[in-house]
Curated annotation (Swiss-Prot):
The keyword Hydrolase applies. One of its GO terms (cellular component) is outer membrane-bounded periplasmic space. The class C beta-lactamase family has a specific amino-acid numbering system known as SANC, for structural alignment-based numbering of class C beta-lactamases, or else the simpler name structural position. A multiple sequence alignment was used to derive a consensus sequence and then the consensus was numbered taking into account insertions and deletions. This allows use of identical numbers, e.g. for active site residues, despite differences in protein length. It comes from Lysobacter lactamgenus. Substrate binds at K335, T336, G337. Keywords: Antibiotic resistance, Hydrolase, Periplasm, Signal. Its EC number is 3.5.2.6. This is Beta-lactamase.
Length: 385
């Protein structure tokens, strides 16, 4: 017994002196920390939150402060504006309404908005609204449109620049009206449909359109491209197009639901899958219901090209996928978002069950956000089995 005890002591002493390799994830941690630190320094970003999921295992990284004034650190409860990532929630709401047979994406707006019958806007389909293929809207609803009556008049007087389904013009008005119509089909205002129905069903308890008073202390201060403090200003159709404020933890849960790593009710699962259907092709990119898809793995060059000025601000010819392409596993499903003072990026690959969220409280050029996101995606891919 004494001889065995002596052997064990010698063995564990030798083990303690040996150079045991660090956990594999520590190298990934260091790479993410290096990339985020360089990014924050280059663009003078006060705070960044990163979330990674690999086969259901979550990892969070918080850097910097949510406000230069208060010096409050970015943490698990920090709320960020996510800009156009909000559109993915609107797409999910519309898909959920379709699963519940409250609408069909093949329908025309006039079925739900009788005041649109007889106008060009009623000639497009709800699918056109959800895929940026209605015929050409400006990026934003004109600033002079403020009331519901003015919004109605705006869409009644709208005329397409090209036939529906032939070109993609990224814009807020179409997605915004898809959200309005989805809520109308559910017989409630959009805010109630989103915050009273969809978000609770998704289990997102820290995601808002209007941040409640009790949560304002966690609402990050955004900064514009000149470093001045700013938060989003509500405008026409702001709720369905850029209104969501959320945390890295809640947004990563949304990603995990999209990856089928977090179980939800069957109808909601079908709705989520419905947003992954491919309807149009633009170069390498497949346009789903708001979500954009690229072949996986996607190079930084591919990501940058898909987020270029040409793709975002110009009308580009698309090819309709007939029949629509069922949800694919080996693709990168992604969406960028920004407001005047915040930036966001979400991406996931169903085949390898990996996903990332990237949130920041400063306006940063798209290419900078994409470069950092690609590094994080590459690192997440290295974590996967």
């Amino acid at each position: 017994m004494k001889r065995l005890l002596a052997f064990c002591l010698l063995f564990f002493a030798a083990l303690g002196q040996a150079k045991v390799p660090p956990p594999a994830r520590s190298a990934a941690d260091a790479e993410i920390q290096r990339a985020v630190a360089a990014f924050m320094q280059q663009y003078q970003v006060p705070g960044v939150a990163v979330g990674i999921t690999v086969d259901g295992a979550e990892r969070y990284y918080n850097y910097g402060v949510s406000s230069r004034k208060t010096q409050a650190k970015v943490g698990a409860n920090t709320l960020f504006e996510v800009g156009s990532v909000s559109k993915t929630f609107t797409a999910t709401l519309a898909s959920y309404a379709q699963v519940n047979q409250q609408l069909s994406l093949a329908d025309h707006p006039g079925k739900y908005l009788p005041e649109m019958k007889g106008h060009d806007f009623d000639k497009v389909t709800l699918l056109n609204l959800g895929t940026h293929t209605a015929g050409g809207f400006p990026m934003q609803v004109p600033t002079q449109v403020k009331t519901d009556q003015q919004l109605t008049a705006y869409f009644q007087s709208w005329h397409p620049q090209y036939p529906a389904g032939t070109k993609r013009t990224y814009a807020n008005p179409g997605i915004g009206m898809l959200g309005v119509i989805a809520a109308k089909s559910m017989r409630m205002p959009f805010q109630k449909a989103m915050t009273g129905v969809l978000l609770p069903k998704l289990g997102l308890t820290n995601t808002y359109l209007t941040v409640p008073p009790a949560k304002m202390a966690f609402y990050a201060q955004g900064y514009d491209d000149k470093g001045q403090p700013v938060r989003m200003s509500p405008g026409a159709l702001w709720e369905p197009t850029y209104g969501i404020k959320t945390t890295a933890r809640d947004l990563l849960r949304f990603v995990e639901i999209n990856l089928d790593q977090v179980k939800v009710e069957p109808k909601l699962k079908r709705a989520i899958d419905g947003t992954h259907v491919g309807y149009y092709r633009l170069g390498e990119m497949t346009q789903g219901l708001v979500w954009e898809q690229l072949p996986y793995p996607a190079s930084e060059t591919s990501l940058q090209a898909n987020s270029s000025q040409k793709v975002i601000f110009e009308s580009n010819a698309v090819a309709a996928l007939t029949p629509p392409r069922p949800p694919q596993a080996n693709v990168l499903i992604n969406k960028t978002g920004s407001t005047r003072g915040f930036g966001a990026y979400v991406a996931f690959n169903p085949a390898r069950k990996i996903g990332i969220v990237l949130l920041m409280n400063r306006s940063v050029p798209m290419d900078g956000r994409i470069k950092l996101a690609h590094t994080i995606l590459d690192t997440a891919g290295g974590m996967a089995k």
